[in-house]
Swiss-Prot record:
This protein binds to the 23S rRNA, and is important in its secondary structure. It is located near the subunit interface in the base of the L7/L12 stalk, and near the tRNA binding site of the peptidyltransferase center. It holds the Pfam family Ribosomal_L6. This is Large ribosomal subunit protein uL6. SUPFAM superfamilies: Ribosomal protein L6. GO terms for cellular component: cytosolic large ribosomal subunit. Belongs to the universal ribosomal protein uL6 family. Part of the 50S ribosomal subunit. The gene is rplF. GO terms for biological process: cytoplasmic translation. GO terms for molecular function: rRNA binding; structural constituent of ribosome. Keywords: Ribonucleoprotein, Ribosomal protein, RNA-binding, rRNA-binding. NCBIfam families: L6_bact (TIGR03654).
Length: 179
């Protein structure tokens, strides 16, 4: 059996889950998250915990995956997910335009407007160099953070650009001039 798949998922108070066909819907205080449930995997509520079971050994690969996705949904609707980004470089900054757009100035000839998808919120600090992305869907939060980082990935020589908070970067040594 999958070691991750056989762990039960604790359901906190105020969280309900519902399976209709091949869609799992988890509702909680922060909102609702829906996930696709592959065939051959079933969810059941036992002693206040969600238990994931599979039909046979051929579904072993997705057993742990389904458990992890449902667990992420339960944590998302109770605590939420956050991802922090840092913007490093002279003149590089981000600012919020309205509620649904982040405007980046990243050394290009034009500012870049990034529209936030529904269910995702962003906050910019006072210095405009740190960005916090929050939401209830872990996949969406990670995808938005990755797309923002891809606007100007860290440069290997000066480490300027958009990076995840706490990300360790290797700095390359530049060319040595002819003497």
């Amino acid at each position: 059996m999958s070691r991750i798949g056989k762990k039960p998922i604790a359901v906190p108070k105020g969280v309900t889950f519902n399976v209709q066909g091949d869609v799992v819907t988890v509702k909680g205080p922060k909102g609702t998250v829906s996930n696709h449930l592959p065939g051959g995997v079933k969810l059941a509520l036992e002693d206040g915990n969600i238990v994931v079971t599979r039909d046979d050994e051929s579904k072993r690969a997705i057993h742990g995956l389904v458990r992890a996705l449902v667990n992420n949904a339960v944590e998302g609707v109770t605590k939420g997910w956050t991802r922090n980004l840092e913007i490093v470089g002279i003149g590089y900054r981000a600012e919020l335009k309205g509620k649904g757009t982040v405007v980046f100035t990243l050394g290009y000839s034009h500012p870049i407007e990034y529209p936030l998808p529904t269910g995702i919120e962003a906050a910019v600090d006072a210095k405009q160099t740190a960005l916090t992305i929050t939401g209830i869907d872990r996949q969406k939060v990670g995808q938005v953070a990755a797309e923002m980082r891809a606007l100007r990935p860290p440069d290997p020589y000066k480490n300027k650009g958009v990076r995840y908070a706490g990300e360790k970067l290797k700095k390359k040594v530049g060319k040595t001039g002819a003497k």
